[in-house]
């Protein structure tokens, strides 16, 4: 049957925010209308071409590749042209032309090509002069018929019979205005006309949703008057509709069929294409064998020396290692992967020569001796029992895949090296596409339809969040009752609003969900090709970047034949690098190359659960696991890293019990003891599954890898086939069928969540390295951690608390000592002359300062000290800190706040920055009244402006202000401790010198209010009801399928902790207490298990309520008459006289030497104590 019509103007969502159709949808529509072919012609790119081609071929539809580009025809004048690939040459030219629009230097107005580009790359290309948006149409709309004919002739001369006029009928006035002239020109020049229809949505009823999509693209609402719109006729018309529409131009319809017959190319998969590593006449096979052999010899020399191996044993090991090396080399070379290994080895060797820290390995690649020999990995695979077949299976050919971790700060240097070696046109990043997912699409649509923000925000919160498997809107409506109710037009349960508008938002969102919204780049993927990328794939380049980006997603880049290399930036490696730099400045050199993993101090620290900052071991649950495990070898760290995941986690107690000989290991069979001995009978690693199959059932390691994969996928048919092979092999090994089936079942259960040992071992090594640095050089290590988290105040708080727990002193921010980043000072810290004078003055005048004034200790003369970074203060950058440091180095310490203002550029200081510097205490050394400085900020900023204006105009005052002046600072009392504590919290996101709850700790212990430090030490596993106190630092409202819940982040003097409120009643009853900065006592359930602890709030009290409603039994110990007098005076003023009381008191009088008591006085009166009283009494409570 002769086809009736073929659409040539179909756009998908790869025309970002312009089409409401996915690739799958356009193919389905073509099949629905019985079209034998379809042309995908997205605007400006070929990003979807391979995906379209593969899907169309799969569905037995002929794909035709097209692209709509802008072409420049005059100065600042651009028109559209539709280019279609006739054959493979034409497709490659489309790749070049579409890529040129992104890589040309003159793309400021729009991405475009020029006539010279079309001339250069016209071979195999069919061109359609777009109708009203094309050159001819634009000239006719401007009433320039002669110019229209001129350009038509020019394009015809370039393309010959491959040039067509497109004609459309969307019932638009501009189309009708030019139609007669357009057809006349085509006739005069013998240019065939082809009928098209813009296809931007599936059916006419989708026009409204598509209109919303266009509003999203422009960032406007539906009511906005001057915005882009399209005709309601831009839908996927049927052949019958098109034939009827162009009944007067039957040739225009027939030409779509004729054009289809001229096109015979479909984009297809390509085999992997790597560049040639060797530019000389030397084979890659020769090179890899040469470099690997030399590398292994060097590795063994280091190994023998570090492990003190005898000469006799060295020869045995050499035989073992070289046998394995040659086995691997044979497989690698037979698979033609030598070049891949050489390329990876080359850029890693270069990185190490430049001092760029590279991870010891990642993924299964660490199981290769060849990789170890070529310095790709730093893990001895034989020593750690790693398998090459887990990485490269000779029985299942697939590309090897090395994921490489680099120091995050220097990753770009490695990428630039690769670009320079292989050519910038052959190396690129990989594009990624952001989609309009459930929450995002609701926000977008709600904004366009002017739904009030509060309602829009509530709607998005109703969609459950899942980072791993994002919940679709359809699924959310199905599973969340309130959303389902709203989707039916019945409104929301908890908020009033226009129910019909809410329904319209959800209906429209359902239509637009899943469309591409924007593009970005893959975080780590880099491709290296053997030819220019544009010969294989479309390329894209960001206007502000220099590096090419492959226009296919990662999946389709690999199908197109490109090889991906993952250049990952691992922050932990940056921590290690920076820590080693700090130690090098002190003359301490750390070399991990010959590390033996036996440092006692490291394991002692880990046994105490001190995992803060230690790679992989930072979570609360992991720290508890360390305390229970008490690791004493690198193998324990590797195993714990592999076990601490959902599923395997349930085996942690068994592993620990067997390690400490509280339980006998179950090895399943005596033959398996050597395989499972290392992990106490627990099958942890995928490599163990492979070895079990090899030893018990006679599998080759390659076949065992296929078994492991089958067990992981749990495909029933495959599992049945593998079980039959396993049992048959075990029977041949004198094992009964029933035992063989039992072992297979047990191993299959473990294999389902078994971990890659090569990866676990490599990351276990990084864990050990960080633990070693922390155990032996805690100050330097924690400073390295802090400096990567300058803007993460929760992490800063955590690391500083860890420093205090390690006996490291913290110097608060100080404008005369602090730098942009955190720094370490040892006991020989230089104390400036101004500091000495302040300390002397404070010693003399301390008694004159009000009791409620907080003066921080400024310096520590003990061992290592961490100096707080200026860049960690909110609104202050590390660059500003450098500016301050450079000024101090050049002209000495600042003498006053006005001296500071005078010496720094006025543009570098603003009110907010100055406020946070003051609140953080940066000027305490220069002026001890922070409140006064804070209140004086407007005058200080005004002074800065006038002073620098005078400097610029050279009109200097006769009297220069050089110290604090009453004309600049307002008069003020001193702030109390809590005010200063919250100043610091506002400026730094943490309580540094004083926590608001510190003064209550003695009282809390009497009221059975726990400190967070006690949660792990004192509570058994299971669910416990406890009372905690904290300051609310963060409040976050979220929504799950079960309803709304609130997460609170609190702190006490020891820790930051998180608790959740699930009950709406609790939220309603205590909402008045749940503001940020509130001091609360919370009654909560604590669930403690291997996964950590989870806190769920049940009720709250304010600190005042606790003080007013609890009875205190005070035991007071004055040491002299003055102290006794102070106690009596205070208590006398708080006598309850029979009314409300909260305390009884007993006073113990002591001898002068404080060794025994003279008298015990139990006071008969009761007292009503207030919060501030404990500031005085706390010093006498034991």
UniProtKB/Swiss-Prot annotation:
Its EC number is 2.7.7.7. InterPro entries: DNA_pol3_alpha_NTPase_dom (IPR011708), DNA_pol3_alpha_thumb_dom (IPR041931), DNA_pol3_finger (IPR040982), DnaE2/DnaE/PolC (IPR004805), DNAPol_HHH (IPR029460), NA-bd_OB_tRNA (IPR004365), PHP_dom (IPR004013), Pol/His_phosphatase_N (IPR003141). Pfam families: DNA_pol3_alpha, DNA_pol3_finger, HHH_6, PHP, tRNA_anti-codon. Keywords: Cytoplasm, DNA replication, DNA-directed DNA polymerase, Nucleotidyltransferase, Transferase. One of its GO terms (molecular function) is nucleic acid binding. GO terms for cellular component: cytoplasm. The keyword Isomerase does not apply. It catalyses: DNA(n) + a 2'-deoxyribonucleoside 5'-triphosphate = DNA(n+1) + diphosphate. DNA polymerase III contains a core (composed of alpha, epsilon and theta chains) that associates with a tau subunit. This core dimerizes to form the PolIII' complex. PolIII' associates with the gamma complex (composed of gamma, delta, delta', psi and chi chains) and with the beta chain to form the complete DNA polymerase III complex. DNA polymerase III is a complex, multichain enzyme responsible for most of the replicative synthesis in bacteria. This DNA polymerase also exhibits 3' to 5' exonuclease activity. The alpha chain is the DNA polymerase. GO terms for biological process: DNA replication. This is DNA polymerase III subunit alpha. Belongs to the DNA polymerase type-C family. DnaE subfamily. It is found in: Cytoplasm. It is an enzyme of class 2 (transferase). PANTHER family: DNA POLYMERASE III SUBUNIT ALPHA. Signal peptide: none annotated. Its main location: cytoplasm.
């Amino acid at each position: 049957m002769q086809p009736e019509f073929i659409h040539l103007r179909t756009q998908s969502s790869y025309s970002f925010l312009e089409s409401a159709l996915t690739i799958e949808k356009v193919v389905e529509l073509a099949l629905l209308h019985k079209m034998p072919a379809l042309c995908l012609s997205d605007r400006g790119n070929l990003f979807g071409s391979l995906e379209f081609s593969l899907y169309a071929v799969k569905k037995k539809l002929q794909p035709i590749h097209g692209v709509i580009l802008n072409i420049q025809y005059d100065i600042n004048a651009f028109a559209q042209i539709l280019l279609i690939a006739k054959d493979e040459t034409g497709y490659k030219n489309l790749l070049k032309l579409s890529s040129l629009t992104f890589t040309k230097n003159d793309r400021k107005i729009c991405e475009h090509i020029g006539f010279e580009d079309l001339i250069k790359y016209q071979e195999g290309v069919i061109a359609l002069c777009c109708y009203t948006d094309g050159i001819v149409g634009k000239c006719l709309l401007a009433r320039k018929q002669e110019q229209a004919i001129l350009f038509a002739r020019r394009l015809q001369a370039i393309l010959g019979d491959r040039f067509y006029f497109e004609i459309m009928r969307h019932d638009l006035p501009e189309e009708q205005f030019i139609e007669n002239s357009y057809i006349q020109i085509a006739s005069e020049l013998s240019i065939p006309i082809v009928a098209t229809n813009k296809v931007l949505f599936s059916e006419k009823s989708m026009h409204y949703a598509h209109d919303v999509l266009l509003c999203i693209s422009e960032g406007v609402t539906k009511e906005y008057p001057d915005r882009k719109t399209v005709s309601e006729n831009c839908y996927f018309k049927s052949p019958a509709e098109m034939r009827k529409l162009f009944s007067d131009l039957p040739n225009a319809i027939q030409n779509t069929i004729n054009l289809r017959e001229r096109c015979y190319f479909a984009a297809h998969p390509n085999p992997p294409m790597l560049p040639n590593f060797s530019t000389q006449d030397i084979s890659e096979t020769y090179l890899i064998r040469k470099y690997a052999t030399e590398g292994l010899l060097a590795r063994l020399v280091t190994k023998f020396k570090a492990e003190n191996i005898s000469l006799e044993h060295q020869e045995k090991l050499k035989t073992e290692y070289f046998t394995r090396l040659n086995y691997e080399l044979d497989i690698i070379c037979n698979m033609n992967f030598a070049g891949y290994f050489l390329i990876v080895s080359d850029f890693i060797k270069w990185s190490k020569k430049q001092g760029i820290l590279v991870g010891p390995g990642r993924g299964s690649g660490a199981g290769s001796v060849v990789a170890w020999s070529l310095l790709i990995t730093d893990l001895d695979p034989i020593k750690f029992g790693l398998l090459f077949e887990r990485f490269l299976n000779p029985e299942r050919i697939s590309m090897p895949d090395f994921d490489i971790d680099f120091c995050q700060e220097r990753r770009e240097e490695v990428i630039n090296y690769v670009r320079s070696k292989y050519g910038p046109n052959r190396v690129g990043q990989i594009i990624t596409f952001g989609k309009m997912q459930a929450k995002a699409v609701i926000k977008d649509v709600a904004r366009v339809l002017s739904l009030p923000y509060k309602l829009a925000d509530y709607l998005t919160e109703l969609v459950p969040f899942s980072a791993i498997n994002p919940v679709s809107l359809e699924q959310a409506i199905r599973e969340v009752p309130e959303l389902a109710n709203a989707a039916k037009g019945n409104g929301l349960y908890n908020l009033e609003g226009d129910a019909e508008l809410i329904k319209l938002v959800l209906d429209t969102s359902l239509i637009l969900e899943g469309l591409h919204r924007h593009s970005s780049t893959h975080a780590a993927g880099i491709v290296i090709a053997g030819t220019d990328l544009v010969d294989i794939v479309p390329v894209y380049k960001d206007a502000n970047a220099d590096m090419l980006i492959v226009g296919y997603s990662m999946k389709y880049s690999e199908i197109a034949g490109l090889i991906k290399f993952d250049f990952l930036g691992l922050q932990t490696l940056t921590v290690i690098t920076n820590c080693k730099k700090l130690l090098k400045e002190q003359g301490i050199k750390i070399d991990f190359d010959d590390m033996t993993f036996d440092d006692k101090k490291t394991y002692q620290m880990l046994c105490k659960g001190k995992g803060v900052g230690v790679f992989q071991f930072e979570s609360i649950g992991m720290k508890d696991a360390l305390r229970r495990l008490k690791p004493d070898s690198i193998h324990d760290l590797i195993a714990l890293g592999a076990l601490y995941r959902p599923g395997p986690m349930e085996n942690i107690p068994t592993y620990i019990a067997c390690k400490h000989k509280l339980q006998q290991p179950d090895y399943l069979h005596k033959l398996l003891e050597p395989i499972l001995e290392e992990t106490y009978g627990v099958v942890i690693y995928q490599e163990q599954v492979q070895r079990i199959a090899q030893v018990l059932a006679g599998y080759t390691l390659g076949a065992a890898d296929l078994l492991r994969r089958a067990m992981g996928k749990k495909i029933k048919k495959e599992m049945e086939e593998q079980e039959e092979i396993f049992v048959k092999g075990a029977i041949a090994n004198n094992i009964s069928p029933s035992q063989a089936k039992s072992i297979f079942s047990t191993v299959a259960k473990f294999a389902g969540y078994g971990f890659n040992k090569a990866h676990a071992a490599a990351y276990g090594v990084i864990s050990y390295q960080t633990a070693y640095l922390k155990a032996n050089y805690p100050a330097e290590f924690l400073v390295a951690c802090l400096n990567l988290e300058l803007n993460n105040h929760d992490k800063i708080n955590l690391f500083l608390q860890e420093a205090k727990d390690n006996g490291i002193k913290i110097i608060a921010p100080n404008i005369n000592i602090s730098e942009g980043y955190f720094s370490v000072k040892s006991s020989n810290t230089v104390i400036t002359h101004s500091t000495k004078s302040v300390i002397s003055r404070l010693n003399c005048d301390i008694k004159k300062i009000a009791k409620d004034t907080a003066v921080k200790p400024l310096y520590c003369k003990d061992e290592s000290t961490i100096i707080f970074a200026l860049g960690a203060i909110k609104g202050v950058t590390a660059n500003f800190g450098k500016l301050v440091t450079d000024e101090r180095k050049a002209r000495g310490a600042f003498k006053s706040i006005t001296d500071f203002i005078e010496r720094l550029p006025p543009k570098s200081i603003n009110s907010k920055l100055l406020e946070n510097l003051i609140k953080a205490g940066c000027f305490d050394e220069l002026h001890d009244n922070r409140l006064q400085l804070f209140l004086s900020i407007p005058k200080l900023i005004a002074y800065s402006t006038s002073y620098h204006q005078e400097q610029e105009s050279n009109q200097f005052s006769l009297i220069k202000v050089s110290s604090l002046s009453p004309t600049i600072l307002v008069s003020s009392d001193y702030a109390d401790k809590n005010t200063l504590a919250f100043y610091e919290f506002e400026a730094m996101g943490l309580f540094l010198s004083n926590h608001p709850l510190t003064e209550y700790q003695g009282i809390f212990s009497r009221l059975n209010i726990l400190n967070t430090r006690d949660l792990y030490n004192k509570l058994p596993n299971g669910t416990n009801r406890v009372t905690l106190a904290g300051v609310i630092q963060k409040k976050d409202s979220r929504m799950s399928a079960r309803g709304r819940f609130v997460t609170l982040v609190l702190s006490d003097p020891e820790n930051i902790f998180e608790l959740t409120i699930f009950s709406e009643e609790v939220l309603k009853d205590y909402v008045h207490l749940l503001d940020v900065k509130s001091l609360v006592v919370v009654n909560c359930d604590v669930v403690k298990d291997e996964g950590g602890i989870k806190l769920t709030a049940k009720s709250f009290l304010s600190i005042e309520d606790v003080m007013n409603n609890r009875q205190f039994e005070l035991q007071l110990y004055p040491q002299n008459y003055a102290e006794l007098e102070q106690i009596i005076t205070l208590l006398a003023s708080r006598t309850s006289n029979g009314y409300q009381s909260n305390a009884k008191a007993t006073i113990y009088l002591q001898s002068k030497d404080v060794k025994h008591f003279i008298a015990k006085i139990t006071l008969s009166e009761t007292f009503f104590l207030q919060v501030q009283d404990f500031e005085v009494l706390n010093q006498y409570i034991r």
